[in-house]
């Protein structure tokens, strides 16, 4: 049975210069992929601030977690390898983890969110959008950034979907667009490098949401104009970060 201590040790050994030790750790992690609570242990090591580990180990845990989710969330025969309890634990805490994670970990958690949303959203993940919206309204820049990043990962699920499959995207736009427009207006009023990065990420959400067609809300000229006009008035930062 996998424990968080054992998982921590295996991950640490995968970073070892000793090839034999690395291979043994990789094999142990592979054998434990779908063991009860293993994905939760990986999640905690990656994102739980009460677990004292360095960034390299958090990143390794997040990458391993992404692999486990891609292999075990929904198998080819329709039977998931991961337990319902473990999946619920990940879903219930993923957005919160993303808003507090360091960037290299947040990126991997975002890919986890995207993989899960492709299977579970919206029916089995009703709390996802409310969690994103709640964090978009916070005064903390990191929380807002994490929420926007989570939103982009969700929207990308529907980026190239047929119109008949885009109803969840339309619902997400209806709920988040007013918050996003309000956020960009606020960022313009108090320009900064961090604010420009948030505005850029908001535009990436918009880009992903409008690849195939405009969601119904954005067919209204006054709604579409809000973000576009705001972006035209956003000052270019002296430093920009590379966003996925």
Ranges and model annotations:
Residues 1-244:
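Karyopherin-beta/Importin-beta family HEAT-repeat alpha-solenoid scaffold
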């Amino acid at each position: 049975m996998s424990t968080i201590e054992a998982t921590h040790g295996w991950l640490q050994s995968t970073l070892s210069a000793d090839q034999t030790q690395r291979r043994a750790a990789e094999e142990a992690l592979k054998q434990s992929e779908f063991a009860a609570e293993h994905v939760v242990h990986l999640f905690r090591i990656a994102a739980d601030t009460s677990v004292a580990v360095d960034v390299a180990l958090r990143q390794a845990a997040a990458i391993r977690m992404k692999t486990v989710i891609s292999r075990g969330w929904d198998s080819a025969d329709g039977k998931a390898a991961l337990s319902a309890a473990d999946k619920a634990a990940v879903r219930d805490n993923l957005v919160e983890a993303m808003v507090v994670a360091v960037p290299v970990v947040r990126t991997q958690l975002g890919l986890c969110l995207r993989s899960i949303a492709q299977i579970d959203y919206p029916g089995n993940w009703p709390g996802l959008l409310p969690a994103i919206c709640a964090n978009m309204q916070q005064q903390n820049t990191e929380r807002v950034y994490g929420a926007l990043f989570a939103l982009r990962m969700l929207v990308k699920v529907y980026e190239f979907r047929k119109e008949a499959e885009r109803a969840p995207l339309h619902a997400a736009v209806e709920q988040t667009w007013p918050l996003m427009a309000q956020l960009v207006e606020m960022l313009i009023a108090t320009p900064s490098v961090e604010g420009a990065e948030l505005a850029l990420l908001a535009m990436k959400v918009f880009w992903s949401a409008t690849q195939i067609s405009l969601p119904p809300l954005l067919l209204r000229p006054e709604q579409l104009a809000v973000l576009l006009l705001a972006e035209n008035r956003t000052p270019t930062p002296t430093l920009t970060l590379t966003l996925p």
